[in-house]
């Protein structure tokens, strides 16, 4: 909707700006109040915290697709949904992948604090290491989180580069 309606895009940007400026602890309080502690609360807080980049970059990617592509699709009888699904989304893939990349990185960052409301996984290991002054345990789990984030980052960036080359947005030498 934001790629077609400037007023909606402006409202969306204000909401996303507010969401991205709030510290991640602010997401824990309402989730804890409404859903109590546990894994569901941790997942919900992680999703809410990490979703703004993919929304913003999806909107940006769809907005940056030249209007001539939509016009060609419409001239061949394409509906709005067909234009979105078969023309605009494929051309916006690099931006979508970067949004996915940023969302994953923020989700990993949130894993460090989700044990405060009942989250499990490597974040709990970091938290337990800090709580028990077990530096090795906390450091090992923290390094594992960082390595996972870096691996996913490199995979998505390499895939994005291939997509940009396939779309002719960059040359193979870059």
Question: What are these regions, as identified by a protein language model?
Answer:
Residues 5, 12-50:
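Generic hydrophobic transmembrane alpha-helix motif, especially the helices
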Residues 33, 107-148, 164-173:
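Glycine-rich helix-loop "coupling/hinge" segments at transmembrane-helix boundaries
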Residues 7-10, 39-40, 70, 81, ...:
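Residues that define the loop-to-transmembrane-helix transition and helix capping
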Residues 11, 53-96, 126:
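Short cytoplasmic-facing helical segments at TM-TM junctions of multi-pass membrane proteins
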Residues 22, 35, 47-51, 58-62, ...:
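Hydrophobic/aromatic residues within the transmembrane alpha-helices of Major Facilitator Superfamily
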Residues 44, 48, 80-114, 136, ...:
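Transmembrane alpha-helices
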């Amino acid at each position: 909707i934001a790629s077609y309606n400037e007023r909606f895009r402006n409202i969306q940007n204000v909401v996303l700006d507010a969401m991205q400026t709030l510290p991640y602890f602010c997401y824990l309080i309402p989730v804890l109040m409404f859903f109590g502690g546990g894994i569901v609360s941790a997942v919900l807080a992680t999703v809410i915290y990490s979703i703004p980049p993919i929304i913003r970059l999806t909107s940006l990617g769809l907005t940056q697709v030249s209007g001539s592509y939509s016009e060609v699709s419409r001239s061949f009888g394409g509906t709005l949904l067909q234009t979105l699904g078969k023309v605009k989304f494929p051309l916006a893939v690099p931006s979508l992948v970067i949004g996915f990349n940023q969302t994953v990185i923020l989700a990993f960052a949130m894993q460090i604090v989700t044990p405060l409301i009942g989250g499990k996984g490597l974040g709990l290991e970091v938290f337990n290491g800090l709580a028990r002054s077990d530096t090795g345990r906390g450091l090992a789990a923290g390094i594992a989180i960082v390595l996972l984030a870096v691996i996913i980052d490199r995979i998505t960036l390499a895939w994005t580069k291939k997509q940009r080359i396939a779309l002719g947005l960059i040359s193979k030498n870059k």
